[in-house]
Amino acid sequence: MIQVESRLEVADNSGAKKVQCIKVIGGSKRRYARVGDVIIVAVKAALPRGKVKKGEVARAVVVRTKKEISRPDGSLIRFDKNAAVLINKAGEPVGTRIFGPVTRELRARNYMKIISLAPEVL
């Protein structure tokens, strides 16, 4: 579960390395974001020649969380770190590569581009 002030790794090659959640999209009182949810983030660390710079505000979709995700078949899936992929207003990823596995839950949210770029879908 991601909330305001949560720090996440960036799982793409947009140039950002670490981001911090500053807003969870979806209602004025929404507190937590799970896998597949869109959040507003501030870039806290970035590469020198990346597409995004430190201090920029961007949108991101959560792709991995430490909090387990329960599946309809009863199985659970969790990751070691929280991670997100930066997206633009249209929902397309800013980067051209995705690092690390992503979950099947993104398919239900219509993030097909992220799923096709990911090396592994769990």
Swiss-Prot record:
SMART domains tied to this protein: Ribosomal_L14
Domain of life of the source: Bacteria
Gene3D superfamilies referenced in this protein's UniProt entry, alphabetically: Ribosomal protein L14
InterPro entries given in the database record: Ribosomal_uL14 (IPR000218), Ribosomal_uL14_bac-type (IPR005745), Ribosomal_uL14_CS (IPR019972), Ribosomal_uL14_sf (IPR036853)
Pfam families in the cross-refs: Ribosomal_L14
Database matches in PROSITE patterns: RIBOSOMAL_L14
GO cellular component, one term: cytosolic large ribosomal subunit
Sorted UniProt keywords: Ribonucleoprotein, Ribosomal protein, RNA-binding, rRNA-binding
An example molecular function term from Gene Ontology annotations: structural constituent of ribosome
GO annotation terms (biological process): translation
Record's subunit section: Part of the 50S ribosomal subunit. Forms a cluster with proteins L3 and L19. In the 70S ribosome, L14 and L19 interact and together make contacts with the 16S rRNA in bridges B5 and B8.
Function according to Swiss-Prot or TrEMBL: Binds to 23S rRNA. Forms part of two intersubunit bridges in the 70S ribosome.
Family: Belongs to the universal ribosomal protein uL14 family.
Descriptive protein name: Large ribosomal subunit protein uL14
Record organism: Magnetococcus marinus (strain ATCC BAA-1437 / JCM 17883 / MC-1)
Organism placement in taxonomy: Bacteria, Pseudomonadati, Pseudomonadota, Alphaproteobacteria, Magnetococcales
